Amino acid sequence: MPKPGVFNFVNKATWDARNALGSLPKETARKNYVDLVSSLSSSSEAPSQGKRGADEKARESKDILVTSEDGITKITFNRPTKKNAISFQMYLDIMHALKNASTDNSVITVFTGTGDYYSSGNDLKNLINDAGEIQDVVATSTKILREFVNCFIDFPKPLVAVVNGPAVGIAVTILALFDAVFASDRATFHTPFSQLSQIPEACSTYMFPKIMGPTKAAEMLLFGKKLTAREAWAQGLVTEVFPESTFETEVWTRLKTYSKLSPNVMRISKELIRKHEKQKLYTVNAEECAAALERMPREEYAKALRNFLFRKAKAKL
């Protein structure tokens, strides 16, 4: 097997896997190699997204559930077997759901997750593709990301996150654009961007220093410190922390109370709170996406992503 190019993620990881297992006894190495390659190859089974436009109409998706009841629109990450990792289609579905929620009869909009995780963030398999298509994949990814974040910047109603478990990456950074964040005491908040050679997103390079101060923001965004729910509350990212045993009951009782408040007053108040910052947020979002677009095609990024996939697959053995 010839050595593959740096952006042929699955084949390159397979190459590394074969070399890494070379020191094991022959039969053990053979079995482990087959298991590892099978795991890596499953990463590439999803249909290619590289040529799909970000303005494509979102399809109905079982991975994003949208319900509306008692004045509350609930948007649920519903991919528990993948720790609610966000696929390309889920990004489109969320944008579609937010557009509908902005004009429906609900008073507030709530995000939460199914299962143990709130969301493990961007599904890195979104960026696995053939070497010849990497530029298209990166361009599409950053275009969708910019539109996705702008949807949160523009959303006119109160936006609440009900963080039922661990949150990673963009599932954390986007929280700074919410109006309230309620967390279970078992939730954690992790932004391992430097580990993955990625640029922070969702206006976090501006909002995190504003919320928690520059040194604490750097601890998360540069050095990848994982925060407990209590630490996130102390730093201002989380509004309130609830015991896991009473989390759902207490939070939803609170939310039903919020849904009885004046919708017009809350919309006007949110507009006044956000209006002086909105243009700044658009600018920061554009700058972060431009930096990501410039960064992603580099070999260092490809190597970090490849190593992540290799470690993840090897851990399953």
UniProtKB/Swiss-Prot annotation:
| Site residues (Important for catalytic activity), renumbered to this chain | 201
Which key words tag this protein in UniProt?
A: Isomerase, Peroxisome
The ACB domain covers: 1-46
**Annotated Gene3D superfamilies:** 1.20.80.10, 2-enoyl-CoA Hydratase, Chain A, domain 1, Lyase 2-enoyl-coa Hydratase, Chain A, domain 2
Listed PROSITE patterns: ACB_2 (PS51228)
Positions bound to substrate = 120-124
User: In which compartments does the protein localize?
Assistant: Peroxisome
Protein's GO biological process: fatty acid beta-oxidation
Stretch list, region Disordered = 40-60
Q: Which reaction does it catalyse?
A: a (3Z)-enoyl-CoA = a 4-saturated (2E)-enoyl-CoA; a (3E)-enoyl-CoA = a 4-saturated (2E)-enoyl-CoA; (3E)-nonenoyl-CoA = (2E)-nonenoyl-CoA
Q: What is its EC number?
A: 5.3.3.8
The record, for Pfam families, names: ACBP, ECH_1
Which GO terms fall under molecular function for this chain's record?
delta(3)-delta(2)-enoyl-CoA isomerase activity; fatty-acyl-CoA binding
On tissue specificity, the annotation reads: Expressed at high levels in the kidney. Also detected at very low levels in the duodenum, jejunum, ileum, heart, liver, lung, and brown adipose tissue (at protein level). In the kidney, expression seems to be localized mainly to the proximal tubule.
User: Top-level EC class, please?
Assistant: isomerase
**A GO CC annotation given for this chain:** peroxisome
Q: Residue ranges for motif Microbody targeting signal?
A: 315-317
Which family does this protein fall into? Belongs to the enoyl-CoA hydratase/isomerase family.
- Give the domain section of the comments: The ACB (acyl-CoA-binding) domain is truncated and may be non-functional.
Q: What does it do?
A: Catalyzes the isomerization of trans-3-nonenoyl-CoA into trans-2-nonenoyl-CoA. May also have activity towards other enoyl-CoA species.
Descriptive protein name: Enoyl-CoA delta isomerase 3, peroxisomal
